[in-house]
Amino acid sequence: MSQLRLYDTARREIVPFEPGEVVTMYTCGITPYDATHLGHAAAYVGYDVLQRRLRDRGHETRCVRNVTDVDDSILGRAREIGVHYLDLAAAETAKFDDDMNALGMLPSWSEPRATSAIADIRGFIGMVLD
């Protein structure tokens, strides 16, 4: 079987990819304030293809894709249309999931929400400020 080679951004070159049995991947997810677009699909199709290739080679994959469910764009859009920001984020995330399912994309292993990490984020900011 031919060796998989990937671009290493730290080294700025294509290098042989020599994963263990389990391959972990992270991709920045959506900020769900409006409809999914082709740019979202293009990014996630690339990760989906890589994940499928790794699985075909016998690796277990764990792809984590976050959802930034609170930020200025969500707050502004929610105010603009008169809904609570969490309701907007939930509705747009559900539409995104439907779109990804329609494309036949593999589901993420985990999809942490930014709102679930606010206490940790505040703690990190406090450490930086101290």
Listing of model-derived features with the role each one plays in the protein:
Residues 1-130:
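N-terminal Rossmann-like or analogous alpha/beta NTP/dinucleotide-binding catalytic cores
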